[in-house]
């Protein structure tokens, strides 16, 4: 088979969720499949993190913007290479594509009501682009992959797609997320002392940052320990608005926001955290849940969308819209050592059920089925 994989953004320096997913899929396929020929389409960038091998060819193609790259430059390159299929990995694909198309549709949040006020121009453009493109390509796809049973049911219902055209393939997590001794004290690049709560909030309303910060304020009022809260990045003006609106000035001297955390440092951040807060209103999967659990760090997560499916039935679940529920579980971890140790073990065991190798194996099986029935 001659397989094309769209991985447009994996060479950029500051990668995000979908970039890491396709990067790990490509790396695992490189390890396991020496028979088929792959063409991985990327945009030029500062971090050439994948190299050519005998049967894997990295195709760098330029373009002034993502829509132009995907709708014009990519189809032209695909046509010239005479591929058997093209796997587009980040929710959208070329509207005009001459080869069998596989689409990974991580979620359909772009079809749901949203608050555009906190979004950048680029984020708003992406939202409109997905709303325009996805309905036009969805019926052309041979298979639509998504990352959880929750999201698969959501997609089937809202886009009227029969189950036989869907494939659910779980994400994995990187093998360097594991219990580690931070002998170099890497965490000190971001926060002075270990034993903090870690939270990946941002301005996206679905990340539930405001309610989580309200919960943290109430935690500080009730806790004798008063642990710091480490957040990766948050706009200062956005934070100030939350503090003023909710009268939670007490969080200001206890919250640490160092900016972007390098991915290679994240295992040390999780290992030195007391617990990880993943209190989103909605997630299609939630790789950070697995990363934290694989490091042996207890997680407090939401009882909504895919999070119970990923975290497993024995994890700590809260109502993300109830700050008091979040606080109660933060305090329970802090005050009940036996419960804390149990959650460490539960997380380690649950994380073992996921891997990028499994993800790649399922992908290869899907490619073979599409090729057979092309």
Feature map (PLM): residue ranges:
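Carbohydrate transferase catalytic cores enriched for Leloir-type hexosyltransferases
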Residues: 1-374
């Amino acid at each position: 088979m001659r397989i094309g994989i769209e991985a447009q953004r994996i060479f950029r320096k500051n990668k995000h969720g979908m970039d890491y997913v396709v990067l790990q899929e490509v790396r695992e396929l490189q390890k396991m499949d020496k028979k088929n020929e792959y063409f991985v389409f990327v945009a030029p960038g500062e971090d050439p993190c994948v190299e050519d091998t005998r049967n894997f060819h990295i195709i760098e193609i330029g373009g002034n913007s993502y829509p132009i790259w995907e709708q014009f430059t990519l189809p032209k390159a695909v046509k010239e290479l005479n591929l058997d299929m093209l796997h587009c990995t980040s929710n959208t694909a070329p509207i005009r594509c001459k080869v069998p198309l596989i689409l990974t549709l991580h979620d359909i949040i772009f079809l749901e009501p949203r608050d555009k006020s906190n979004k950048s121009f680029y984020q708003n453009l992406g939202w409109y682009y997905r709303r325009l493109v996805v309905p036009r390509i969805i019926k052309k796809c041979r298979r639509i992959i998504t990352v959880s049973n929750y999201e698969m049911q959501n997609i089937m219902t809202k886009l009227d797609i029969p189950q036989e055209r869907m494939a659910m393939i779980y994400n994995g997590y990187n093998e360097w997320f594991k219990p580690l001794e931070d002998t170099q004290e890497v965490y000190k690049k971001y926060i002075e002392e270990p034993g903090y709560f870690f939270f990946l909030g941002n301005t996206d309303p679905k990340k539930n940052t405001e309610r989580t910060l309200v919960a943290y304020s109430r935690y500080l009022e009730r806790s004798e320990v008063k642990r710091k809260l480490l957040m990766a990045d948050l706009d200062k003006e956005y934070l100030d608005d939350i503090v003023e609106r909710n009268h939670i000035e007490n969080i200001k001297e206890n919250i640490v926001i160092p900016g972007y955390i390098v991915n290679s440092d994240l295992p040390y951040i999780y290992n030195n955290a007391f617990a990880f807060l993943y209190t989103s209103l909605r997630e299609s999967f939630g790789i950070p849940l697995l990363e934290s659990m694989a490091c042996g760090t207890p997680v407090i997560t939401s009882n909504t969308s895919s999070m119970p499916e990923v975290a497993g039935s024995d994890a700590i679940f809260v109502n993300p819209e109830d700050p008091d529920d979040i606080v109660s579980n933060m305090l329970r971890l802090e005050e009940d050592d036996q419960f804390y140790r149990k959650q460490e073990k539960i997380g380690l065991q649950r994380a073992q059920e996921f891997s990028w190798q499994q993800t790649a194996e399922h992908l290869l099986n899907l490619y073979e089925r599409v090729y057979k029935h092309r």
